[in-house]
Amino acid sequence: MDLLTSSLIGIGLSMDCFAVALAIGTSERLPLVRSALVIAASFGIFQAGMTIAGWIAGASLYTEISSYGSWIAFLLLAGIGIKMIYDGIREEHEPTLSGLHAIPVILLSLATSIDAFAAGVSFGVLGSTVLMPALAIGLVCFVVSCAGVFCGMRLEKLLGNRTEIFGGVILILIGIQILTDILPL
């Protein structure tokens, strides 16, 4: 598979990462560059890693877990989204993802990389190599996620504390979209 095709697949797989990074950016209170790099690195590594894992696992395992993948992503995104909304409404406000705690970032990275697993399975079924596509997907996701965090942080400056509620709603909507494939996000 050539670099252009791999990069285009990476752009498609990165759209959920962009939206989630945007939501994280609205609640983040750390230095802009550090936050963006940590979040984007986590998302990019998970996208690349899940692509490789899907390629290794092959089509038989995918058919067994594919019916659960959407539910797993939905539950992770909705749970973190509900927590963000709750924290945004509370009087004593302490951002959900402030401090870049590892668990929420890893869970969001996992939730947004389930499609990359499926892409990896398709690479395996097609007999394609996986290293170059996985690296391209991870790099594209890194760049797109950085942009999402930056945009979210700018949005937070415009809207103030309400952005955590906005970010939580975005995560829940992404979870619903993944679950139903009905909502056009």
UniProtKB/Swiss-Prot annotation:
Pfam families xrefs: Mntp
Recorded topology in the membrane: Multi-pass membrane protein
Domain of life: Archaea
Keyword Membrane part of the UniProt annotation: yes
Record keywords, A-Z: Cell membrane, Ion transport, Manganese, Membrane, Transmembrane, Transmembrane helix, Transport
Principal location class: membrane
Location within or outside the cell: Cell membrane
Positions of transmembrane segments: 4-24, 36-56, 65-85, 105-125, 130-150, 165-185
Keyword Manganese listed: yes
Annotated signal sequence range: none
A cellular component annotation (GO) from this entry: plasma membrane
GO MF term (any one): manganese ion transmembrane transporter activity
Function: Probably functions as a manganese efflux pump.
Family of the protein in this entry: Belongs to the MntP (TC 9.B.29) family.
Protein name from the UniProt record: Putative manganese efflux pump MntP
Name of the gene encoding the protein in the UniProt record: mntP
